[in-house]
Amino acid sequence: MEDGTLMSYTKELIEQLADEVINWTRDFVNKISPTMKVVIGISGGKDSSVVAAILKEAIGVDRIIAVQMPCEKQIDIADSNKVIKELGLVNHYCINIGSSYYELCSEFRKHTKKELPDTFTTNTPARLRMTTLYGIAAIFGGLVVNTCNRSEDVVGYSTKFGDHAGDFAPINHLTTEEVIAIGDYLGLSYELTHKVPADGMSLNDDGSLKGDEIKLGFTYHEVNEIIRNNIHSEHYDKIVDMWKKNYHKFNLNLPCYIPQNLNDYFDK
């Protein structure tokens, strides 16, 4: 659905966005260390594919550690293999989180005597994947890159302290269409950049992945028009309501109580 209607971007604007995000990424990482590695989860979706391409331009493939993390079985793992091969990501690992996830599910059922709600089964794999990325970062030394985009954040298609975690986020303020355009500009295969967005957890009757837009009932293009132009479309109220409900995911700084008088006390 998304690919049928795209916002209009000039070639010059996309070149500028691509150059800016590459330079920003290079500066951020190199400021910490000119030899710093970056760990990225490679799902085969457009976001991780485009961020990997940005990293390649910014710091080179030798400093990228790509990690595939299927949960037992991943229907579209061929796409993540394609990303690794196409970008020449020489440092890559495939760590299956399936056994850890199902063991954890078993422990929760045993101790709580409860069936696990969708909020558990949807978000726990994402949090295990982030734990895996930080594990790799601890072993080899490196930063973990966040690959979330603004459009999917708005509708809640990211997990707090799961895929929405990380040490820096190159595309978090870019819409899906801007991510696609940058991926095209950087020369990624059309099948990767224009892949139907899907969370990988829901299937169609034929066993293929069910797209996000089918489940949402509206397109990311409509979301993007609201983000960039505040256009009052058919699903405007619904999308804005989702945006408000998911705003807490954008603000990763935890709300904290700040005592007002302690400094005065210790100054006495």
Q: Where are the regions that the model predicts?
A:
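ATP/NTP-dependent adenylation/nucleotidyl-transfer catalytic domains that generate, transfer
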Residues: M1-I40, A53-E57, D62-I65, C71-K73, ...
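Conserved G/P- and acidic residue-centered "switch" motifs that form tight phosphate/ATP-binding loops
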Residues: G45
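Conserved Walker A/P-loop ATP-binding site and its immediately adjacent core
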Residues: D76
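Catalytic core regions of nucleotide second-messenger enzymes
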Residues: D79
